[in-house]
Structure formats: C-alpha cells, structure tokens
Amino acid sequence: MKKYRMVFILCLFFSFFCPFMVCAKEFVSAKEGLDVMFVMDYSGSMKTNDSRDIARGMVKAFVDTVHSADIRVGFVAYNDRILTFTSPLAIQTEEERADLKKLIDQEQYAGNTDIGLGLSYGLELLEEEAVRKRVIVLISDGEPDLEGSNTGRTTEISKEDLKLAAEKCTENGIQIYSIAFGDYDGNTEVLKSISESTSAQMYSAETPERLIEVLYGIFGTNMDYSIQKITDGVFAHGIQNFHVGLEENYTDEMDVLLISPEKIGNVSIFYDGQELPTANHGNYVVGKIIEPDNEIRELDIRTETLESQELQLYLIS
C-alpha cells in the first residue's frame, strides 16, 4: 500500500489570522489485527478539564477517521462505577461507527474516580485471539479517589486493582497506554509506572484538542496510516480557504479532519472539482475520500471561522 507525501501547502485566507504552522510527523506501519480498548474517566472532575465535552469528541473523531480494515474498538466509561461498556467492535461501516459513538455519548461526567475498577473491567472485555494484538488506552485526569463514594470500595482497593490489572496485562502481552488528561490531579508516576510495566508509554494531553494527536501518536507502530497537520492557527472572523497540493500515490482512503474548541461553521471540501459530503459534529468535522485517484493532485477546503477561533486541520491516509 503506497503512501502520499505533502509537497506544498498554499493557504489563502480572506481575513487576517495568526497561524502557528506545524510540520506533521508521519507515522507508517504495516501491523494487522488490532483490538483497542478505550478506558475513559467520566468522573466529576472531568467537567472542569473538559467543560465542552471535546475529549470524548476526540475519541469519536479517532473512530471516524482511523482506517478500519483490521481494527476493532472497545470502550469503557467509568467513575466510581462502570457506566457504559462494550467489547471490541468492528468499525468498518458508518452504522458501526455510529453505534459506538452513541455509547461514548451516553453518560455525563459525575462521581468519584476508580481507575482500578475501570482498567480491570476493560481488561476482562479483551478476548484473547492469537492473531490479534491487544492494546488498552487509559484516559484519566487524576489518581483513584473514592472519598465519599458509597460503592463500598476504597481508594486503596482501587490502587491494588490497578496494580493487579497491570500485572495481568504484562503477563498477556497487552500494552497499557495511559494519558494524563487536562490539569491532572495527583502524581502521574502511577500512570507512567503501569504503562512502562507493559512496555508502553504515558502521554500528557493538557487540552482536549491535543488528545487526537496523542491518540494517533500512540498507534504509529500499530496501524497502517499517515497523519499530517496542515494548519494550527487562530483565525479572524470570515471565510478561510486552504489549497493543498499532493503528489505520489495515496492509500485507498483519505480523511480530512478539522478540530476546534468552538463550534465549527460550514465546511466545504472539493476534490476533482466535486464537493465531498462532510459530517459536522460540532467541535470536529470529517470528510472522507474513498479510493483517491492518483492523477488528482489538489484538494481545496473552505470553512467559516468566528473571531479568534482556534482551528486545526489534518489529513489522514
């Protein structure tokens, strides 16, 4: 499967802006057969760190844009209880992705934090299959805290369960990638320790928008894809136009992803003179190009921004 490389980017803006252009790091892998289990903190403190629900939006954006030929995604939402869950599911069709995203949106942030419970439950949902790699992505904004919880569990029990789950993952070759989210409450050494014990890594995502880059960074050695950041800027009110030049061959799918902490306005994506359908989910917008034509070397993207609106634009293939 051949890759493409961006050779030039010409951004034409009809209003003044202050861009922070960032060169994308490209990740390529030929791994196959991957089961990913997201274990995500839905405790009350997440209301402060993610007041606009962008963090779970970035998990949904990952589901919408990851190339899904041989990947299955599971999900556990926890606070001091297990709120929602599913074992790894195929996400090849729009309907499959919609079902998983509906589950992610089902509960609100509330309650205490029982990381040990969430991680243990996520591990139980990962079925062992010899031909598939298994990975857990643990997202939390703080250490276990069950003070005032009426579940009968204590912070000490949660920490012990966290340790035991990490040991089981090590024994079974399951990596735990942990993400310290937002203004992390506590010592991140706990997350770092359990990740490193499974030959994985801990990441920090200080802002919700940063989470998508962390997620794609985690899977750089587990999946066959490339991600490139086209722009990362603060824009004035008005219409913004991005003209992207491409060369060499593409893969069999290319995704355009726009992200903003504020609601994104109308987005138009033009490829080969045709406007592509887009899905606007508020804080992120996705446009898909299925089986790109190798002869087409241009892509145009148009969107409307508010005054001082932050906007990130990515190409994923």
Question: Could you describe each region identified by the protein language model?
Answer:
Residues 28-90, 107, 115-122, 127, ...:
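Von Willebrand factor
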Residues 33, 70, 131-133, 173, ...:
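A general structural motif
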Residues 9-19:
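Bacterial N-terminal signal peptides
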Residues 50, 106-107, 112, 117, ...:
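VWA/integrin I-like adhesion module and closely mimicked acidic/polar interface patches used
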Residues 202-317:
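C-terminal "exit" segments of structured domains
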Residues 1-8:
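Bacterial N-terminal signal peptides that target proteins for export
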Residues 18-30:
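Sec-dependent signal peptide cleavage junction
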